[in-house]
Design a protein with these regions (language model features):
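Solvent-exposed soluble domains appended to multi-pass membrane proteins
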Residues: 1-175
């Protein structure tokens, strides 16, 4: 059933793009999945030929990778092989659309340049270097400071609404 749904999704995406392809209004479509299908531990152990706890950092990262694409009906430089955490996809989209970035998105933009993948599993640098969970000491001082700034602001954004820096997470409501 999963593969037949993939085929149906492909058809729907094709229809969506064909609909917007020739419009005069600039249009951007962002498509991604937030997780791989839940195929069960047995499936992954057969796939890797080992117990899940014995996987390399790279193999653990692979389990969490999901493809995405950004399509526009106007000229946009084509990029392939972009690897980033889904929490940074909104910032990349805003950059490509030419939107002004909030303070929080500017922090995300710096993170995109330094640690484009930052998850509970670990980190990936732009050059592809992986740092697994528990190896935060492998981060440079600059990377660690940037990631700590991000974690603090993410916490503030989610749990401390009364202490939000004015206009940092979105348009200033006073303006």
């Amino acid at each position: 059933q999963y593969f037949s749904l993939l085929r149906e999704s492909d058809k729907a995406i094709q229809a969506l793009i064909e609909h917007y392809q020739d419009l005069d209004e600039r249009t951007m479509i962002v498509f991604f999945g937030d997780h791989q299908p839940p195929l069960g531990n047995d499936f992954y152990e057969k796939l890797y030929g080992k117990k899940l706890d014995d996987r390399t950092t790279e193999e653990v990262f692979q389990q969490y990778e999901v493809p995405f694409f950004i399509w526009t009906n106007y000229d946009q430089p084509e990029r392939e092989g972009v690897v980033l955490s889904s929490n940074l996809l909104g910032t990349l989209t805003a950059q490509l659309a030419g939107f002004p970035l909030t303070g929080y998105q500017q922090l995300h933009s710096r993170l995109l340049d330094v640690l484009p993948v930052n998850t509970t599993v670990g980190f990936r640098r732009p050059d592809g270097t992986l740092l697994g969970e528990g190896e935060e000491s492998g981060l440079t001082e600059t990377e660690e400071q940037l990631y700590n700034d991000y974690r603090l602001m993410a916490y503030n954004h989610l749990f401390d609404e009364k202490a939000h820096p004015e206009g940092y997470f979105g348009p200033d409501p006073e303006k």
